[in-house]
Amino acid sequence: MKNSERRKKNEAYLEFAQAYLERTQIQSTVNLAETESTPEDAQMAVQNTGGYNVKTELLVENDYVLVGSSSVIGRRQSQQDSVTIPCDTQLLLEEHPKFLCVLSDGMGGLRGGEQASACATQTLFDDYYRIMWRHCTHSYLDFFRAEAEKINTLVRGLKDENGAPLQAGATLIAAAVDGEELHFLNIGDSRIYLVRDGKMLQLTHDQNYLTRLMEKVRSGEITEQEALSHPKREALISYCGIRELSMVEINLQPLQLKSGDVIVLCSDGLYRLLSRQEMIDVLQETAEDMNLAAFKLTAAATDKNFRGQDNTSVILIKIK
């Protein structure tokens, strides 16, 4: 991709972001007019300390894929979502698209959740580029299985400054693009979607108590209404940091990707506020700029003005 084209897209994104922040009266700590939108830097474009705390990386793109991300704090006291995407030099291996994107939603107090999600995303991301990227001797199934156990142990062992267990946890989703194949990992209730031909398909399954309640619905033990109104329906039954990690979702067969496909990774802060059709509409409006689309998705969630808005994060991967 030419530098001039990249610059135009980044400038369009920055213009929209500035207008949005001004309209919503969120004060940014970055002077967007002076932000360098260079293709070499996947630098932070917006990070504010106002009501929502917007964090977005500048566009990552080559001739094969576009990658964008955005994260907002919502109305919480801390940002416990963690998002890790590759830089330009980590997208290709010998002209072969090969990269990993990771998202995690932490839980466990002001600092516990933040540390748990950061531990999960950074461990998986670093290990992927150390083990799988150049000299791959493992299958994705074996790699993801081993990483799930490793990360669960690491998160469970996190301690505070006094040496006391943090008792924190985190969801974890990861999408690995390898040529025309998609491999993914899921622990918890963050989601991965595939948008193809105007339709949005959820690839992962939520690992929460509602899953077990719906099994009882199918067996006739309770009604669907009872399941959907159960006070503990959203409680996680699998997450990084749990005593015994028994539920890890990995696709056994790689998903074959097509030109025009968009892979969406998001925390529950997004899909609980936006319908699938609302997400599709944003993606269709901003089809050629995944960074702007990511920002618009988190902005749309924020515009719902939900009093208890959770941290909201999204990663978008478009196959050209």
Regions found by a protein language model. Name each.
Residues 1-320:
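PP2C/PPM-type serine/threonine phosphatase catalytic domain
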